[in-house]
């Protein structure tokens, strides 16, 4: 999420690779999770040179001035269980920082992060002027030292909540010299393209795992016994309802939706009748994340036994671009 660190500090502006350079490293997946299942690609490098933001596919899965690739965990409970950050390519550790607290910048009492936006971080030199920088690492989790040689896929730390971030994720910046490189489309002179395959600097396995999701993605989905908010989802999700719970609620938290998208969530009972439905107005702008829930109070005598179903869809120009169905048996 945060801009890159140079001597573990922020660079003021994004500069993209534009000149011939030594052969770049091939980047393996830099985190020990399964993208699309227990982690998701939240943000790309901002390739727009102006005041707007745009990713390599001409989409909005980035924000102004963003200089790296953000891979987020599904919630903070996953961070607390521990997820390793991996060296993306062979190299030598040249800089690191530890000791920054794991706390959201939105949390009451969060310390200032100016000049330390990366939080706890590790910079690895891959030769030929190429570097990768891993940010927002968990305090006390760094397993390498300056001068140490590392192999691709070697654990170097764990995902944390340090620095300029609101949610647990790995921010990976790629540089050649002082210039930031988009690993999905390394040619700085190349215009964004909706047809770009995004293979870039990645190994074939990493490119497949990090494939672009134009319709966004479902980060969390489940059932609850009452209203749902982001704090409850981050903590691992609200309690699952039972037949005598105060209410039966279905919820979905999605990421990377576009302005104009219409999220729809429907809750259906065992008899096939709709219990509740939520259809949002078209989103006024692109949303990094969007939480929706729908439900109904428990009737006298409790919920009838059977299979309860939730159907979620995101409509774009009246066509579904994202869908998820999930069930609960009571």
Give the role of each language-model region.
Residues 71, 110-125, 137, 148-213:
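Conserved, short, structured surface segments that act as functional micro-motifs
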Residues 319-330:
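Short beta-strand elements
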Residues 284-298:
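Aromatic sugar-binding surface patches on proteins
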Residues 20-119, 152, 194-247, 251-256:
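Surface-exposed, glycine-biased beta-strand/turn segments
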Residues 79-82, 86, 126, 130-153:
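Short histidine-centered loop motifs in beta-beta connectors
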Residues 304-315:
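A short tyrosine-centered beta-strand micro-motif
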Residues 259-267:
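Beta-strand-rich binding/interaction modules
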Residues 275-286:
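Solvent-exposed serine/threonine-rich low-complexity stretches and specific carbohydrate-binding patches
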């Amino acid at each position: 999420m945060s801009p890159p660190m140079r001597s573990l500090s922020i660079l003021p502006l994004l500069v993209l690779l534009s000149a011939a350079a030594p052969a770049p490293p091939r980047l393996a997946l830099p985190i020990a999770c399964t993208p699309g299942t227990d982690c998701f690609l939240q943000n790309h490098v901002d390739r727009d040179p102006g005041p707007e933001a745009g990713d390599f596919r001409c989409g909005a899965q980035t924000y102004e001035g963003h200089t790296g690739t953000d891979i987020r965990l599904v919630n903070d409970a996953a961070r607390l269980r521990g997820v390793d950050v991996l060296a993306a390519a062979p190299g030598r550790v040249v800089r690191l920082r530890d000791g920054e607290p794991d706390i959201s910048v939105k949390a009451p009492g969060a310390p200032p992060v100016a000049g330390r936006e990366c939080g706890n971080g590790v910079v690895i030199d891959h030769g030929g002027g190429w570097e990768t920088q891993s940010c927002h690492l968990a305090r006390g989790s760094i397993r390498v030292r300056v001068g140490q040689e590392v192999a691709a896929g070697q654990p170097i730390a764990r995902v944390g909540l340090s620095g300029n971030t609101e949610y647990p994720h790995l921010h990976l910046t790629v540089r050649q010299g002082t210039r930031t490189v988009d690993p999905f489309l390394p040619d700085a002179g190349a215009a964004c393209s909706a047809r770009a395959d995004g293979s870039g600097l990645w190994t074939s396995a990493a490119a497949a795992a990090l494939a672009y999701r134009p319709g966004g993605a479902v980060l969390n989905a489940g059932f609850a016994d009452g209203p749902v908010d982001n704090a409850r989802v981050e903590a691992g999700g609200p309690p699952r309802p039972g037949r005598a719970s105060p209410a039966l609620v279905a919820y979905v938290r999605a990421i990377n939706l576009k302005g104009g998208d219409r999220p729809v969530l429907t809750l259906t009972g065992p008899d096939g009748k709709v219990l509740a439905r939520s259809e949002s107005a078209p989103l006024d702008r692109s949303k990094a994340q969007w939480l929706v829930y729908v439900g109904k109070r428990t009737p006298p005598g409790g919920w009838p036994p059977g299979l309860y179903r939730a159907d979620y869809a995101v409509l774009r120009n009246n066509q579904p671009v994202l869908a998820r169905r999930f069930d609960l048996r009571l």
